[in-house]
Amino acid sequence: PLYHMNGLAICKVAFAGHLGIVLLPQFDAKEYISAIEKYKVTWLTSVAAMMAMVVREGDLLSTTNLSSVRIVRMGSAPVSEQLVRDIKRILPNAKITNGYGTTEAGPVVYGQHPEGLAQPDISVGYPIANIARLVDGNNVNAQYGELHCKNPAVMPGYNKLPEKTKEAFSEDGWYKTGDIMRSDENGFHYFVGRVDDMFNCGGENIYPSEVEKMLERHSEIEQACVVPVTDQIKGFKPVAFVVRREGSDLSEDGIKQYALANGPAYQHPRVVSFVEKLPLTGTNKIDRKRLDARSESARKRDK
């Protein structure tokens, strides 16, 4: 959407280069693919869920020329390694980048590595000095924690919401994004999840995106979304909504066993529901609230 930071930033880049912009009334995977060929689009910007829907259109992709695409830039949600591989398969000429920014603090948070190291495909980039930091409790130079930002683009506050504004800033004036990041050995950051998406299962903190990435490494899983349901003993437990790849007959038990073999036991989904596609919000992110509402029936199945 043009009222979000990504839409605004990309428009500025295009206008600065005297380039045209293709705007669609709403996202539809088939129309998106057709527009790329019709207008010979060179740069795509999207949310990961959009590209996950695009790569599923095998029949249309096989008859459409997408060779014009040189850059695919994603943001606003975690990107899995499997999705990157799928995009490279259908867009072999394209460079894939994963970006980050917030409407409250602008798009300039991450940049190039000072030693020229290549950005890993699923990383959001290297933090710009004095603009981004990871905070874990009193540690403001953490390797794993909430991302805080401070730069000239940071908003003065939310309009007529003084309490929400106060909650959004640290005592020393940094904007608290609510996004959990981790840093690798080279200093690149990776999106882990949202502070408000995290839930506790039997004393263990679970970030849904970590479980989703693990599940999406399975060769027969196209997409996965994990939401919590209440549990009298554990507090909350994970439930997974899964889109299988075409032709797959992967079972619920097969997914549970895969999760137990490839991640901590507490992360494995107690119930798996198969869906044709995941619901999206108006900003093309996965609509977790709608899945939350559907997870109650899944909770009853696990009793």
Show the residue positions of the predicted features:
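Conserved AMP-binding/adenylation subdomain of ANL enzymes
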Residues: Y3-T42, E57
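Gly/Ser/Thr-rich phosphate-binding loop
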Residues: A16, V41-S46, V55-Q119, R133, ...
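Short hydrophobic/charged patches on amphipathic alpha-helices used for structural packing
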Residues: K30-I33, L61-T63, K166, E212
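AMP-binding/adenylate-forming catalytic core of the ANL superfamily
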Residues: L44, N151, P156-G157, I180-Q267, ...
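Active-site glycine-centered loops adjacent to acidic/histidine catalytic or metal-binding residues
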Residues: S76, G101, G125, D179, ...
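Beta-strand->loop->alpha-helix junctions that form or flank phosphate-binding loops
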Residues: I96-E104, S123-P127, V227-T230, S273
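Conserved ATP/PPi-binding loop(s) of AMP-dependent carboxylate-activating enzymes
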Residues: Y126-A129, N138-A168, E204-I206
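Acidic/polar alpha-helix N-cap and adjacent early helical turns
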Residues: A293-K303
